[in-house]
């Protein structure tokens, strides 16, 4: 199983970097993990809606260039499907049974994801109706992927 995580922007906070490193190490026993960062574009607070779309479209071009034809693409979206940890584990397990050995999770930048990425998405996943910083979302996603593999393999993991 290959899992790629494409994320807009770099992680700057040390505590988040440490958490990402820890879960990346733990996941190495269950899958081949590849974290891909694409540069975010600076977005001023007072951008018009059309300017926001331009920023999202430019970030989307960078994201799309990293997505392979063989990827099953799961985008993280506020309006996506909200799952329990057990249901996410079942989703990942079912994808492998269906022959999808390359899963790609996509985390957008501060303005969200551009239309071309949303159109390429095979599944929209939401962790909450809350908005999270994309750096923190990367850590939360890694923890949930790790938890999923523990559930799939009937291994203990704290609740």
UniProtKB/Swiss-Prot annotation:
Subcellular location: Cytoplasm
Gene Ontology terms, MF aspect: rRNA (pseudouridine-N3-)-methyltransferase activity
Cellular component, GO, one term: cytoplasm
Alphabetical UniProt keywords: Cytoplasm, Methyltransferase, rRNA processing, S-adenosyl-L-methionine, Transferase
Primary subcellular site in the record, as a coarse category: cytoplasm
EC number: 2.1.1.177
Catalytic activity line of the entry: pseudouridine(1915) in 23S rRNA + S-adenosyl-L-methionine = N(3)-methylpseudouridine(1915) in 23S rRNA + S-adenosyl-L-homocysteine + H(+)
Pfam family, one: SPOUT_MTase
Disulfide bonds: none
Domain of life: Bacteria
Residue sites binding S-adenosyl-L-methionine per the record: 76, 108
PANTHER family the UniProt entry points to: METHYLTRANSFERASE (PTHR33603), RIBOSOMAL RNA LARGE SUBUNIT METHYLTRANSFERASE H (PTHR33603:SF1)
Subunit structure: Homodimer.
Family: Belongs to the RNA methyltransferase RlmH family.
Family annotation (HAMAP family): 23SrRNA_methyltr_H
Function, in words: Specifically methylates the pseudouridine at position 1915 (m3Psi1915) in 23S rRNA.
Name the record gives this protein: Ribosomal RNA large subunit methyltransferase H
Source organism of the structure: Finegoldia magna (strain ATCC 29328 / DSM 20472 / WAL 2508)
């Amino acid at each position: 199983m290959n899992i790629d995580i494409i994320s807009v922007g770099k992680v700057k906070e040390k505590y988040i970097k440490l958490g990402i490193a820890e879960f990346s190490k733990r996941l190495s026993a269950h899958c081949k993990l590849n974290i891909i960062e694409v540069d975010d574009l600076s977005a001023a607070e007072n951008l018009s809606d059309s300017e926001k779309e331009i920023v999202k479209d430019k970030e989307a071009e960078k994201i799309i260039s990293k997505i392979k034809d063989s990827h099953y693409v799961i985008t993280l979206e506020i309006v996506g499907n909200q799952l329990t940890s057990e249901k996410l584990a079942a989703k990942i397990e079912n994808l492998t049974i269906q022959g999808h050995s390359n899963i790609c999770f996509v985390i957008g930048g501060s303005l969200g994801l551009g239309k071309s990425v949303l159109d390429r998405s095979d599944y929209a996943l939401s962790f909450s109706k809350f908005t999270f910083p994309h750096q923190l979302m990367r850590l939360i996603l890694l923890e949930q992927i790790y938890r999923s593999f523990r559930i799939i393999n009937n291994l203990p993991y704290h609740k």
